[in-house]
Amino acid sequence: MGRFLFVASSACWFVFLSLSGAKGNNCPQDWLPMNGLCYKIFNELKAWKDAEMFCRKYKPGCHLASIHLYGESPEIAEYISDYHKGQSEVWIGLCDKKKDFSWEWTDRSCTDYLSWDKNQPDHYQNKEFCVELVSNTGYRLWNDQVCESKNAFLCQCKF
């Protein structure tokens, strides 16, 4: 009997902790919760810098999204496919400020994962220094693009 109570109480404690963690996410409706952050696609077309400024003004600590694991890509791609109204590419927070193929995230997190489309990045005509998710790859692969191009964009925030 004592062993059963221990197992039952341990199981209840595990369920409680699991539910507490899920609730602690607090992402608003139509945002994607993932790894303690919330992601939202904005369909308004903006240049990369304007998109980053929009994310920062939306809520302190928000930025264009950074992607750090292969496992995050399919979830983000599915979310964008569900909520993106249009065919444009989607800005993320990766850029090459130094214009020397040293890519950095706007949230200053480590550049520990890259998912370039075929033959990318190429800095085509020495003009492409901002990164977009490519629509014809299902938003899974990246392309460097002219920063003044107008795209939808993906913000990440902590709520």
Curated annotation (Swiss-Prot):
Disulfide-bond pairs as recorded: C27-C38, C55-C155, C62-C157, C130-C147
Motif (Galactose-binding): 120-122
Tissue specificity comment: Expressed by the venom gland.
SMART domains in UniProt: CLECT (SM00034)
One GO biological process term: negative regulation of cell growth
Family matches, as PANTHER family: MANNOSE, PHOSPHOLIPASE, LECTIN RECEPTOR RELATED
This protein's name: C-type lectin BJcuL
Organism: Bothrops jararacussu
